[in-house]
Amino acid sequence: MPIRDPEKLQLALEHHFKVKICRRCNARNPWNAERCRRCKSRDLRPKRYKK
């Protein structure tokens, strides 16, 4: 069931996509992370949003 309210949609997207993914071990990390919590790599990317 899609979310129609734009404020709730924005909140849900921010909650779901405001993470960083490690390119080495694919772990989810906090948005402000500089290193991976699992493998200590610095190779992080923001989670991609696919429409």
Curated annotation (Swiss-Prot):
GO terms for molecular function: structural constituent of ribosome. One of its GO terms (biological process) is translation. SUPFAM superfamilies: Zn-binding ribosomal proteins. The keyword Ribonucleoprotein applies. It comes from the Archaea. Keywords: Ribonucleoprotein, Ribosomal protein. GO terms for cellular component: ribonucleoprotein complex; ribosome. Belongs to the eukaryotic ribosomal protein eL40 family. HAMAP family: Ribosomal_eL40. This is Large ribosomal subunit protein eL40. The gene is rpl40e.
